[in-house]
Amino acid sequence: GNITVGGTGKTPTAQYLAASIRDMGYRVVILNRGYRAKWRGDVGIVSDGQKLYMDATEAGDEAFMLAKHLPEVPVLIGAERSLTGQYAIEHFGAEVAILDDGYQHWQLARDMDILLVDAVNVFGNGYMLPRGTLREPVSHIERADVCLLTKVDQAVGVSREHIKNTIRKYNEKALIMESIHQPRRFVDLKDWHRDISGEGVDI
C-alpha cells in the first residue's frame, strides 16, 4: 500500500509479486477491495485462477486487470479482507495472500508490509487529507518492512538519496528498493474491458 492518495503503482506491484510467488510454486491469491465495483457482498470471486467470473464494471478495473493477467491466481474482492482471506484459505488452499492497497487495512494480520513511495510526488505537500494527499502521517513509515520507490526514472527536483534519508529517519530497518514503470502496449479503450487475451499494440 501507500500513505498517500493517488497512483503509486500498487496494483502493478501486486501483479508482479503474485506472478513471482506463483512461479515459485506457492498457491497465491490476491485480495482486492473492489474499488468502484458495482458488485456488493462479502466475498466476490473475480477469478478462480482459471476463469473470469466478473467484468471490469462488476469487479472494478483494478481487480479485473489483475484477474485478466494472472492465470492460476484467484482474485477476490470485498471490503473486509479478513473474510476474503479466510475464504481464500478454505476454498483455494491459499498459502500466500497479497493485499492490493492494504497498508491501512488493520482487520487482517500480515507477515510483511510493503510501502510504495512515489518518487515523483513523494509525500505531497506534507499535509493530511483533506488539506493534502497524506492518508496518514509520514512517521507511519515505521510500520513498513519494505519501502519500494516507484517511478524513480521520472523523478525531477528531488534526489533518490533525499527520499531514502527521509525513510531512514522514521525506519532504519526497512529494506529500500527502487522500480521504474514502463508501458508495454496500447489497448483500444472502447474494447479493453472485453479483451482477455492481453493483445494490444506493442510500444
Regions found by a protein language model. Give the residues of each.
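Phosphate/Mg2+-binding loops and adjacent switch elements
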Residues: 35-178, 185
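Functionally constrained cores in energy, signaling, and assembly domains
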Residues: 2, 6, 13-21, 85, ...
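C-terminal-of-GTPase-core extension/linker across diverse P-loop GTPases
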Residues: 175-203
